[in-house]
């Protein structure tokens, strides 16, 4: 592999040699029971031998029910300046305290999918998952030790994430379609025996996309949105007047599309219907915003879009 660009991500050109082999075998235990075995071996000229096995089991008790269990390991080499954009914002000094080791993980996932078809043509799909992931050598940005620094090091301990998620997919014969999902998780970092919550990570979230077609009016209405729970934010020490946790917040949009013409569609709508921005109720969102080149400028606290309510109009032309 060879990669170079004109950003700080590659101050010098990066060359990596990786030799890999991947094997996979599906075993049919019975008509409704399948096992998938997989293994990957890599040799990295910087990190040596890497072996990542995986196993998956699938059970179809009926044509409308599917159970899955997956377990395996992971391996990841982190590039701070392409993945951790906070390192390039604000006036905080970036401190790397050691030669960073690759992250490794162990995970298990349970999944259930249910499909229901009603006599009137309505389709209802339900999917739920539960998972657990354990990380070694995870690279965590430390905003707390020194408010003027972002300190990067491999976690001297472990990190874990335990969560559940669900999705509902509804399609009706009278023009209504809906996809609604949620995620609840419990992330935790343990450093030197001390447990903490990762910054900029919400414990629950939801999303939805609802469409209603009105053929006699040649009209389609789309309503989409996201909901986010509180997340811990990187404040500048005990004297920082900004809240340590974000509020519950939501971004919601609506769009109307007129489809009477063969190749043209007219559309318009409103983005951020609730006119929510993260600076509401906060003394100041960005530290030192009046002097973006000053020593106190810090944009790491920004956790959501800053654009308020706005409208839009457009024309869509279909060639084929």
Each predicted region: which residue ranges?
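Transmembrane beta-strands of outer-membrane beta-barrel proteins
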Residues: 1, 35-37, 67-69, 108, ...
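Transmembrane beta-strands of outer-membrane beta-barrel pores
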Residues: 1-4, 17, 39-45, 59, ...
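Membrane-embedded beta-barrel scaffold of Gram-negative outer-membrane proteins
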Residues: 2, 60, 68, 101-154, ...
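Surface-exposed extracellular loop regions of Gram-negative outer-membrane beta-barrel proteins
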Residues: 12-44, 50-54, 168-186
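Residues on the lipid-exposed face of transmembrane beta-strands in outer-membrane beta-barrel proteins
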Residues: 21-27, 55-59, 110-114, 164-170, ...
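Outer-membrane beta-barrel strand-turn architecture
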Residues: 23, 27-31, 59-63, 104, ...
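Gram-negative outer-membrane beta-barrel transporters
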Residues: 28-32, 125-134, 154-235, 316-318
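C-terminal beta-signal and adjacent terminal beta-strands/loops
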Residues: 227-235, 258-320
């Amino acid at each position: 592999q060879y990669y170079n660009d004109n950003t700080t991500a590659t101050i010098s050109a990066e060359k990596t040699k990786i030799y890999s082999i991947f094997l996979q075998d599906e075993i049919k235990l019975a008509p409704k029971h399948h096992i998938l075995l997989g293994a990957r071996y890599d040799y990295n000229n910087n990190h040596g031998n890497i072996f990542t096995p995986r196993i998956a089991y699938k059970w179809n008790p009926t044509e409308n029910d599917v159970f899955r269990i997956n377990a395996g390991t992971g391996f990841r080499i982190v590039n701070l300046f392409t993945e951790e954009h906070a390192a390039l914002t604000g006036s905080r000094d970036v401190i790397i305290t050691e030669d960073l080791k690759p992250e490794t993980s162990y995970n298990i996932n349970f999944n259930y999918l249910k499909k229901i078809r009603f006599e009137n043509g309505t389709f209802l799909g339900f999917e739920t998952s539960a998972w657990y992931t354990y990380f070694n050598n995870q690279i965590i940005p430390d905003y707390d030790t020194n408010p003027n620094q972002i300190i990067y090091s491999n976690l001297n301990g472990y990190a874990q994430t335990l969560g559940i998620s669900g999705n509902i997919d509804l399609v009706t014969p009278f023009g209504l379609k809906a996809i609604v999902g949620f995620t609840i998780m419990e992330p935790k970092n343990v450093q030197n025996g001390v447990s903490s919550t990762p910054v900029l990570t919400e414990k629950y979230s939801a999303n939805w996309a609802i469409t209603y077609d009105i053929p006699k009016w040649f009209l389609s209405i789309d309503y989409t949105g996201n909901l986010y729970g509180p997340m811990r934010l990187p404040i500048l020490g005990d004297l920082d007047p900004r809240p340590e946790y974000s509020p519950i917040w939501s971004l919601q949009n609506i769009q109307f599309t007129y489809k009477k013409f063969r190749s043209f569609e007219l559309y318009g709508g409103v983005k951020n219907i609730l006119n929510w921005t993260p600076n509401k109720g906060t003394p100041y969102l960005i530290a030192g915003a009046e002097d973006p080149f000053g020593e106190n400028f810090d944009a790491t606290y920004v956790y959501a879009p800053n654009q308020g309510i706005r409208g839009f109009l457009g024309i869509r032309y279909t060639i084929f």
